[in-house]
């Protein structure tokens, strides 16, 4: 009897169980599947002042700017801060969405900061797995970077 009890005790001790623990962090965002969602992501990163998100939404046909080694991390952050200043906005409205050379899209966007509205073009390109904002006209939105918008 004693051997049976020890055998059952050993068997119970060797039993394994699996417990599924849900992850507590956010699930990764899905990459934008088109030019407009990529523009929305870029402008949301600008508005949120999110350097990491901006580096993922800004790129070219080879991929995100943050993932290539053409510029240093320090230079990337300086450029992102400039973009955040120039394209600072409270709201935006997308006008034209036109196919241009090289498979790119040109979107005309009106950015509003306070009572000031400026319109510029954003150029978007399809990368290996998603779309990116490649460049945008900064001259037209220069005054959005001012400390205060005019009343």
Question: Residue locations for each model-derived region?
Answer:
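C-terminal motif of bacterial Sec signal peptides marking the signal peptidase cleavage site
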Residues: 11-13
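Short, low-complexity N-terminal intrinsically disordered segments enriched in polar/charged residues
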Residues: 15-48
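Exposed beta-sheet edge and beta->alpha loop/turn motif
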Residues: 84-151
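Sec-dependent signal peptide recognition
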Residues: 2-7
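Short solvent-exposed beta->alpha transition segments
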Residues: 29, 36-40, 51-102
């Amino acid at each position: 009897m004693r051997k049976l009890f020890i055998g059952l005790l050993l068997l119970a001790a060797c039993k394994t169980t699996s417990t599924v623990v849900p992850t507590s962090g956010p699930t990764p965002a899905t990459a934008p599947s088109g030019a407009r969602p990529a523009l929305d992501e870029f402008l949301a990163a600008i508005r949120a002042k999110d350097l990491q998100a901006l580096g993922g939404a800004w790129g070219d046909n080879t991929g995100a700017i943050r993932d290539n080694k053409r510029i240093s991390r320090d230079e990337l952050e300086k450029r992102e801060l400039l973009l955040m200043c120039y394209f600072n906005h409270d709201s935006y409205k997308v006008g034209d969405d036109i196919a241009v050379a090289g498979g790119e899209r040109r979107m005309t966007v009106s950015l509003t900061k306070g009572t000031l509205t400026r319109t510029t073009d954003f150029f978007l390109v399809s990368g290996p797995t998603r779309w990116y904002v490649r460049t945008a006209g900064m001259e037209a939105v220069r005054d959005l970077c001012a400390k205060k918008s005019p009343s």
